[in-house]
Amino acid sequence: MMLKPSIDTLLDKVPSKYSLVILEAKRAHELEAGAPATQEFKSVKSTLRALEEIESGNVVIHPDPEGKREAVRRRAEEERLRKEEEERKIKEQIAKEKEEGEKI
């Protein structure tokens, strides 16, 4: 049975097979917890989805701990801004519906 993505392709993306296992496990946990996907998947299982993301280069190991912290901060800020925008749109919709209701 041939595994997709292949182990050889994946090992080109990370320094060692141990790093690959850790990266795959962490990303699979993130996906299970509801983290946004970086691409469309062929696989159903989160572990295989994580490997697909690693193969495509969308998920990488940060050799620099500060770089990882910055990426986490940036992701948290993007999520905060997305939620604020969503709340703003909901409030606008409520105000619009309320205004239309008062006109009747």
Curated annotation (Swiss-Prot):
Gene3D superfamilies: 3.90.940.10
KW Transcription (keyword) present: yes
Keyword rRNA-binding recorded: no
GO biological process: one example: DNA-templated transcription
UniProt GO MF annotations: DNA binding; DNA-directed RNA polymerase activity
One GO cellular component term: DNA-directed RNA polymerase complex
UniProt KW keywords: DNA-directed RNA polymerase, Nucleotidyltransferase, Transcription, Transferase
SUPFAM superfamilies in alphabetical order: RPB6/omega subunit-like
Classification via InterPro entries: DNA-dir_RNA_pol_omega, Pol_omega/Rpo6/RPB6, RPB6/omega-like_sf
Region ranges (Disordered): 60-104
Family annotation (Pfam families): RNA_pol_Rpb6
Catalytic activity: RNA(n) + a ribonucleoside 5'-triphosphate = RNA(n+1) + diphosphate
Complex and partners: The RNAP catalytic core consists of 2 alpha, 1 beta, 1 beta' and 1 omega subunit. When a sigma factor is associated with the core the holoenzyme is formed, which can initiate transcription.
HAMAP family (alphabetical): RNApol_bact_RpoZ
NCBIfam families named among the record's database cross-references: rpoZ (TIGR00690)
The protein's name: DNA-directed RNA polymerase subunit omega
Organism expressing this protein natively: Streptococcus sanguinis (strain SK36)
